[in-house]
């Protein structure tokens, strides 16, 4: 299949970076991370109008619903288990060993994230409705949230690994019959009808959000449905009752996921992925392996709180688009209104992280 940059001037300098996508997919082919084969990259605009690359077509299943309905509990459990193992394999890839040492900054990921989202939220809150002139306004507890997240003494240990940026079940392609990941994708756009459970034009192998960053950002994104399931559906979006404790047979708990993830991420990577001297990645993984489990639990709580805050900020952005009449659908309205409940929930998680003694999250349900 061919993936090309859209014609014309792009609003975002980082969007549709097909050259970057090719680079990481091609590099990961040397590892045990399941990615499609990238055959060639053409940066000559005269061929098809914009740069493009050609890659392998993945013929498999995509589960739009992360609960994975209509399968047996054992299959559901195995699907989630391989997704978790796949993420851990990605995170244990040393960027130097595959030529991606310049793919992003190796330190300071969460500090940059906090600064970026503070700036974005400030701009979004100042947007005024074109008719009422009422400002969108800040998120609840915004100043306190920013103060907490910016406090380096509260942040997780600074780590730098390859991260996907939007890792979740519906961004993966699974084997047609086996509970096995055959490729990592990224959600690009939504079609109005439901496609069959195979790779369609609803999913394209984009890695636009990938960089070098803290691996906790990916693992917290993967388990987000477990946390948002606690919310009132009338005040939020994407509240999936199937992720409530014991609601779905075969679905792992967050603790199950964390345990499997760290068991794989902390293991030594394959020999062809290990440089001659220890990298910062290897050292941080070794440090994580030896860390007090209570510290690890605290870091996971911090990362989840930040991820929920980020969702609130995204919904605030949709509210700003509504105010400027750049969006008008009912779905957009619901997302815009969800910013309040998500920000309140992020604040609850922050308070829990502050007072936590390091206990795990979620003890109910089946084991991987």
What are the language-model segments listed below?
Residues 53-56, 85-88, 115, 119, ...:
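Generic alpha-helical structural context detector
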Residues 162-164, 169:
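Catalytic-loop of the protein kinase fold
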Residues 199, 217-272, 277-288, 306-325:
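Active-site activation/catalytic loop segments of kinase-like enzymes and analogous catalytic loops
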């Amino acid at each position: 299949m061919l993936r090309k940059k859209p014609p014309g001037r792009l609003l975002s300098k980082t969007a549709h970076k097909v050259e970057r996508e090719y680079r990481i997919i091609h590099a990961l082919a040397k590892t045990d991370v399941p990615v499609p084969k990238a055959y060639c990259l053409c940066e000559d605009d005269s061929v098809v109008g914009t740069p493009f690359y050609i890659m392998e077509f993945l013929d498999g299943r995509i589960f739009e619903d992360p609960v994975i309905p209509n399968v047996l509990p054992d299959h559901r459990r195995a699907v989630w288990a391989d997704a978790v193992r796949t993420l851990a394999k990605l995170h244990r890839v040393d960027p130097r060993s595959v030529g991606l040492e310049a793919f992003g900054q190796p330190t300071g990921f969460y500090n940059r994230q906090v600064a970026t989202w503070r700036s974005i939220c400030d701009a979004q809150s100042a947007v005024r409705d074109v008719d009422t002139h009422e400002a969108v306004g800040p998120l609840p507890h915004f100043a306190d949230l920013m103060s907490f997240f910016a406090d380096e003494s509260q942040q997780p240990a600074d780590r730098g690994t390859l991260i996907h940026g939007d890792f979740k079940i519906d961004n993966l392609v699974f084997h047609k019959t086996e509970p096995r990941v055959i490729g990592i994708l990224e959600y690009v756009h939504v079609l109005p009808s439901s496609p069959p459970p195979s790779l369609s034009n609803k999913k394209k192998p984009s890695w636009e959000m990938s960089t070098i960053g803290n691996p906790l950002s990916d693992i917290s994104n993967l388990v987000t449905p477990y946390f948002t399931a606690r919310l009132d559906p009338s005040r939020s979006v994407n509240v999936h009752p199937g992720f409530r404790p014991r609601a779905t047979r075969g679905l792992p708990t967050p603790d199950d996921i964390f345990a499997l993830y760290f068991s794989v991420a902390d293991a030594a990577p394959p020999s062809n992925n290990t440089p001659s001297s220890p990298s910062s990645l290897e050292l941080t993984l070794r440090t994580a392996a030896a860390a007090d489990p209570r510290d690890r639990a605290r870091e996971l709580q911090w990362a989840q709180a930040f991820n929920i805050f980020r969702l609130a900020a995204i919904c605030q952005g949709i509210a700003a688009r509504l105010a400027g009449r750049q969006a008008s659908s009912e779905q957009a309205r619901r997302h815009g209104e969800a910013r309040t409940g998500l920000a309140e929930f992020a604040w609850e998680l922050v308070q829990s992280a502050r007072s936590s003694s390091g206990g795990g999250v979620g003890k109910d349900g089946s084991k991987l």
